[in-house]
């Protein structure tokens, strides 16, 4: 699936939905390794951005997104609309990230 065909909106200008295939999702659970936890702990004493956790969150979001798009491919979708992310702390330093949306088949609108 072309990542350009994913959107947080529920419509795509110049296209119309031919079929709605249902909800697709990607879920991952991440935990920072001990070295990152220690470095982040020291960095948090000074305040500001904690790069170790930012990197972990970005990797988790990217992985959840990739799993979601693979799920949409399996269903035969060529687009995903209404893409959203959510995160839940499962335990200390362990976070679940989910990416979800509506798998659809879209076609370009006919030119007038």
Regions found by a protein language model. Name each.
Residues 24, 29, 37-84:
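Short, well-ordered alpha-helical segments
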Residues 74-107:
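Surface-exposed short loop/turn segments
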Residues 1-36, 95-112:
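N-terminal presequence-like segments and the immediate start of the first folded domain
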Residues 1, 12, 56, 68, ...:
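Detector for methionine-enriched segments
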């Amino acid at each position: 699936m072309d990542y350009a065909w994913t959107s947080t909106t529920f419509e795509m200008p110049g296209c119309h939905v031919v079929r709605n295939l249902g909800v697709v999702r990607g879920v991952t659970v991440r935990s920072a390794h001990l070295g990152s936890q220690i470095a982040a702990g020291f960095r948090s004493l000074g305040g500001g951005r904690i790069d170790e956790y930012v990197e972990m969150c970005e990797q988790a979001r990217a992985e959840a997104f990739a799993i979601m798009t693979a799920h949409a491919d399996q269903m035969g979708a060529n687009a995903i609309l209404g893409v959203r992310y959510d995160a839940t702390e499962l335990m200390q330093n362990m976070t679940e990230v989910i990416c979800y949306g509506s798998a659809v088949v879209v076609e370009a609108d006919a030119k007038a």
